[in-house]
Amino acid sequence: MNTILELHNLKKYFATQKAVDDISFDIQQGDIFGLLGPNGAGKTTLIRMITGIFYPDSGSILFEGKKFDPINDARHIGYMPEERGLYRKMKIGEQALYLAQLKGMSRHEAMQKVKLWFEKFEMQTWWHKRVEDLSKGMSQKLQFVTTVLHEPKLIILDEPFSGLDPVNANLIKDEIFRLAKNGSTIIFSTHRMEQVEEICDHIALVNKGKKILDGTVKNIKHTFKENHYQIGVAVLPEHLMTHIFKVISAQSDSLLVQLFEDTRTNDVLRYFINKNIDVYSFKEVLPSLSDIFIKLVNGSPEARQFLSINHNHE
């Protein structure tokens, strides 16, 4: 797999404040890459450097193995910012055509693509409406279409599901998977952990302008696992005092336990067999990305903010 984007030791200052502080990571072609962090973490500044809106104060960006050229390479990038960039007084069909032509498409080619996407998203009747007449969710769908219709190699989506109902959120999600399958690379910037776990292959977690970690979602969760297991049982044993695991929580037919360091899973199963208790499920529980973030930043205000946001959406 080819590396499409490389960030090397990027730094960006605003006056004396470090918005991005020595961040490096690579993104592979066809990946769905999650860029995570609380508000003010540096995500938007990082994205604006990747798209050529800002220049880094130091460090380098390589696009397809060459030094990033903001003028020429930007045409291969589709960017959907969190603060939506649509012209409110302009008619929707003309706006989509105009934005496609800005990315180098002929009007004829743009017309074909816009009609295709409008039909796919059931937007055909919107053509003569103005953006100011659209709901937030409708504006979101239009912004997504104008971001991807020129078939960019790199697609950057900043909070793309904001304001969408579940049906349209799933529609966008399916398109993200399809675009990645067809070779587009997607950067998904968000503070919503559950969406990242569902969608992304790789992630980078940033806080206060610094990268805290990056890697595959699977590897990160396995790195931070704590020997937690969910055990489904026919009945709870009367006494749960044991030297092989600690009970974290108990319900009428299940236990969440943490195995002690030298305990094997067979030891746990043997414990219940000896008590004549049937075990009907036994599953390792990996930490959520939200749990990992909280652990890494160790109870900071950013961690509390992140915890509140993500628990409110669970």
Question: Which residue stretches match the model-derived regions?
Answer:
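ABC transporter nucleotide-binding domains
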Residues: 2-5, 12-207, 213
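ABC transporter nucleotide-binding domain
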Residues: 173-260
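Short, charged/small-residue-rich alpha-helical element at the C-terminal edge
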Residues: 227-300
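Residues at or immediately preceding the N-termini of alpha-helices
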Residues: 107, 217, 262-265
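ABC-family P-loop ATPase nucleotide-binding domain
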Residues: 1-11, 299-314
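Short, basic, helix/turn surface patches
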Residues: 95, 139, 235-238, 304-314
